[in-house]
């Protein structure tokens, strides 16, 4: 049911921001790191400049998200289309909440590795659980000048990959905050312009997104394109009309395979 994922991206701004990709159900997928430069030289000179690519096999898309809904058979009297919409709506919200939670705070054990978890080389993973990141700094938004300095540090942190390679992150950094804290920031940077319209503007066009899964007084900065949020295969909803026959219920079971993990330690910060 493709409409479920369309609704996810419109109703949950965080899921829209990371750009979930449907890859099809595959057991492994490849990642690559490229190096080398094209080299200038004289006409008729020798060909130089070797380009290298290192491929690595990532873990399988093996995290399964499941949910089920049991509804009275009598509901069919209201029409099968209505019943389907009722079931889809419930599953839609359950999957949206579960995916958002996992992509933000998931510990990696039978679920995606969230933005708040360490993924750098040498990270000690115990029984499938990735350790939590420690706070890398403090954002106060105390004044315009202080805010510029604080956000400059955030952008500079994300502008270099873990392997030391520079990265252009202009317009690519998002700050994920609890809805309560978002209003404190908006209040500080909302003003009335010459046209009599209130506008909210932050340095460097920083994008702020709210999520209930971010603890109060904490913020997560991330570069969305550097987090792999993959959906494996189509959502599968099965109907069982005999499983709960004595209870006079129809059972709808849904499952979806997903994978989530930052490309390296510098993709996100707490």
Feature names for model-found ranges:
Residues 1, 72, 176-181, 223, ...:
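Helix N-cap / beta->alpha transition motif
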Residues 1-68:
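Assembly/oligomerization interface modules of large self-assembling protein complexes
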Residues 40-43, 81, 186-190, 218-221, ...:
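Short conserved micro-motifs at the rims of enzyme active sites and ligand-binding pockets
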Residues 50, 100, 218:
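Active-site and NAD+-binding cores of ADP-ribose-processing enzymes
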Residues 56-154, 270:
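Alpha-helical scaffold segments that mediate packing/assembly in large oligomeric complexes
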Residues 117-246, 250, 256:
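Extended oligomerization regions of viral-like shell subunits
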Residues 248, 269-270:
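Low-complexity, Gly/Ser/Thr/Pro-rich intrinsically disordered linker/tail segments
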